[in-house]
Amino acid sequence: MIPAKPFLCVITDEQCSSPVDLALMALEGGAEMIQLRHKSASGKQLFQWALDIQRLCRIHHAQFIVNDRVDIALAMNADGVHLGQQDLQPGEARKLLGTDKIIGVSTSSLTEALNAERAGADYIGFGHIFQTGSKNKLSAPLGSAAISAVVQRISIPLVAIGGINKMNMMETIAAGASGIAMIAAISRTADPEGATRAITELLKGH
């Protein structure tokens, strides 16, 4: 089940030495969803991290999502999977995971958002909204106005991502985002738990 809006999804940072420790700090700070994302880790390492993070998510009553790897999500019964545009199609992932799992899809345009919904996604990640250093981005930021344009055309939740921080996050919620996804704003701070708590408290006060 997708958390009640507005919610925070913390995505693990590949520059972080321990995704499990980061997940724990984010959960202690009140994050409602954790997404394990690590493109270069081995399947064995990802699976172990996934097991550890899922256990923590269960304790904290949070949702656990695996990025890209439907096989790992299936093997360890994760709450869901998040797919990129070049990954398995949502409909195919649904056949493998079943109807009760969460399937998210990364999008960066209205067309991609509409296609993701038609294909059976439960939510879309939409961005990048603001300038970000978490990934190498060649395209210009979409801006919060793009969120408003998309949410008027889809019926599934939109999770805003890309350059979102404590200073601009409420702009995305006001534009219609159901949730926000963060990487650097949590992982690259001296106190990830405190940073998460400050953000979740702002969201609760919305």
From Swiss-Prot:
Q: What is this protein called?
A: Thiamine-phosphate synthase
How would you classify this enzyme at the top EC level?
transferase
What Enzyme Commission number(s) apply to this enzyme?
2.5.1.3
Gene Ontology biological process terms, A to Z: thiamine biosynthetic process; thiamine diphosphate biosynthetic process
Q: Which PANTHER family match?
A: THIAMINE BIOSYNTHETIC BIFUNCTIONAL ENZYME, THIAMINE-PHOSPHATE PYROPHOSPHORYLASE
The cysteines joined by S-S bonds are none
This protein's cofactor list reads: Mg(2+)
The record's section on InterPro entries has: Aldolase_TIM, ThiamineP_synth_sf, ThiamineP_synth_TenI, TMP_synthase
Pathway connected to this protein: Cofactor biosynthesis; thiamine diphosphate biosynthesis; thiamine phosphate from 4-amino-2-methyl-5-diphosphomethylpyrimidine and 4-methyl-5-(2-phosphoethyl)-thiazole: step 1/1
Family assignment from sequence similarity: Belongs to the thiamine-phosphate synthase family.
Q: How is the cofactor bound?
A: Binds 1 Mg(2+) ion per subunit.
Q: Which residue windows are coiled coil?
A: none
| Catalyzed reaction equations | 2-[(2R,5Z)-2-carboxy-4-methylthiazol-5(2H)-ylidene]ethyl phosphate + 4-amino-2-methyl-5-(diphosphooxymethyl)pyrimidine + 2 H(+) = thiamine phosphate + CO2 + diphosphate; 2-(2-carboxy-4-methylthiazol-5-yl)ethyl phosphate + 4-amino-2-methyl-5-(diphosphooxymethyl)pyrimidine + 2 H(+) = thiamine phosphate + CO2 + diphosphate; 4-methyl-5-(2-phosphooxyethyl)-thiazole + 4-amino-2-methyl-5-(diphosphooxymethyl)pyrimidine + H(+) = thiamine phosphate + diphosphate
| Entry superkingdom | Bacteria
- Gene that specifies this protein: thiE
Q: Which organism is it from?
A: Chlorobium phaeobacteroides (strain DSM 266 / SMG 266 / 2430)
Q: Which UniProt keywords apply?
A: Magnesium, Metal-binding, Thiamine biosynthesis, Transferase
Residues that bind 4-amino-2-methyl-5-(diphosphooxymethyl)pyrimidine:
35-39, 67, 106, 135
